[in-house]
Amino acid sequence: MRSSSRNSRKPRRVLGLAAAVSLLLGSAAQAGEHNFVLTAYTNGRGGQALVSGDYDSAGKALSYKPTLSAFDNSTNSNNRCVSLTVTRQWDAARIACDKAVKDAEREKATLPSFEAWARGTEDDFVAVALSNRAVLRWRTSDSEAAAADLKRAAELSPKSTFVQRNLSALEYSHQALARVDVASK
C-alpha cells in the first residue's frame, strides 16, 4: 500500500536497512566477499526478526494481512521472500520472490512524474528484489537464472554492495561452495 507521502516513507525505508548477519550455508572460515547475501527491510514487517535470526517470529509477522498503516507491498513481499528462502520453503519462496520483484517494478512504474527524483531509489528496491530472487535461484540450483537476475540488478543499481557481493559469490560458487548471509542495505 502506498503512503500518501513517498517523501517521508522512502528515506525511512532506506534508513531501515541494516548490516549483514551470517545465516546459513558453508563454513564460517570462508571469506565474506564470497557469501551470498539476502537483503531485508528492517523497518518492514518481520525485518528486525529476520536480521536477528528469529525466523519463526518473522514468518508469523509476515503471515498477517497488511493493514492500512502497513508498509507497501514490495517491502512485505521482499521480507517474505527472505523469510521463506532462509527457512528453505522453496516453492513458497519462489512465489514470494517473484511477487517481490513484481511489486517493486510496479512501484517504480507507477511513480508519479513529480517524484522523478526518487527513480534511483526505486531502481535500488527492484535490485534488492532481484538480488534476493537470485540467491533463491542459486540455492535451488538454477545458476543461469540467478546470473540473469544479478545482471539486471547490477544494471539498475551498479553501486549496490549487496548486488556486487552476490555477483562475486555466484562467480566464486562455480569454483567452491559459497554461503548465504542475510543483510540490509
Feature-to-residue mapping (PLM):
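Flexible helix-coil transition and linker loops at the boundaries of alpha-helical arrays
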Residues: E33, Y64-N73, D103-D123
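Terminal, low-structured helical/coil segments at or just beyond the last alpha-helical repeat
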Residues: N35-F36, L136, A147-K185
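Alpha-helical segment of the N-proximal tetratricopeptide repeat
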Residues: V37-L68
